[in-house]
Amino acid sequence: MLRICSLAITMLLLFAHGAAAEPAGPAEVRVVFVRDGVFTSPTDSAWDEIPETNYALLAQQITPPIGGGSVSNVCVRATHDGDEIAFRLQWFDPSADRGVGVDTFRDAAAIGFPVGRPNVAPSPFMGDEAHPVVIWQWAADFDADAEGKSRFGERYPHAEGVWIFPQDLSVRRKVRGWRGADPVIEYISKGFGTLTPRMETTVEGASEYEDGRWSVVLRRKLETSNEVDPVFIPGTTSSLILAIWNGEEKEVNGRKAVTYQWIPAKLDGIGSPTAKADVGASNVRRE
């Protein structure tokens, strides 16, 4: 009888320990209310006043082509001013990869959001048939094109004397009203294999590569006229997922570093005081 009681107590203790050891969900991103407009520059020192949250990334192992994961950590900061919302992503990468060729790939980053405010969370793996997601993807080559930069010389450094274009794109960039390719593409997705680019994008992006680290800002109006869009309401919580591609490591398409759970993003109410950061941008972990 004593043996049975002892076994029962042991099982109860093991169950209790297992319940207590159940991993908690990811920490939330606080979307801080700012009064004077969101920060559009990735290197604006004002970002240092915004709390950061670091997220571990893992290789995509759900569907072919599996792989990636060379970037192990990304830092997220976010703000809104009642009119626009902005997210800044930072991660370490030993090289800035802006070229695309047969055997070269670009660096890129993406944030995914549920469409609308669903009662049931979509699959964190690019959504599902009943619950689509919208994905904002920034790519290093798009950003270079938008700025009118020439990537020909980067890829063929010894061929600058044989210029095949009528004029340098950097000159065209100075023309009033010039705008090249958007640095951000919006997609709609209902699961793996359904990724579809949208005809128009309402998201703007900017990037900076310095000291082995990418800093990327993605921003959008809080309200849009598109019903198939993420919804951001001050004082409420949305959610997001993250992905990073390292071109140097041949990461493209499904080969990427990702978060495997939805991350809560809590928007401050309008008029909330701006928080002081507990840690600065320099504390992004180098792994």
Give the role of each language-model region:
Residues A21-W47, D103-R176, S225-E287:
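Acidic/polar low-complexity flexible segments
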Residues R77-G82, V100-V102, Y209:
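Short, solvent-exposed beta-strand/turn "edge" segments of beta-rich domains on protein surfaces
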Residues C5-A16:
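Bacterial N-terminal signal peptides
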Residues G205-G212, D229-P234:
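Exposed beta-sheet edge/beta-hairpin loop segments within beta-rich domains
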Residues D93-V100, N226-E227:
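Short amphipathic, basic-aromatic surface patches that mediate peripheral association
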Residues E84-W91, W214-R220:
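Short, well-ordered beta-strand segments enriched in hydrophobic/aromatic residues
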Residues S150-Y209:
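Long, low-complexity, polar/charged, intrinsically disordered or flexibly structured peripheral segments
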Residues G69-V74:
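Early extracytoplasmic/domain-onset interaction patches
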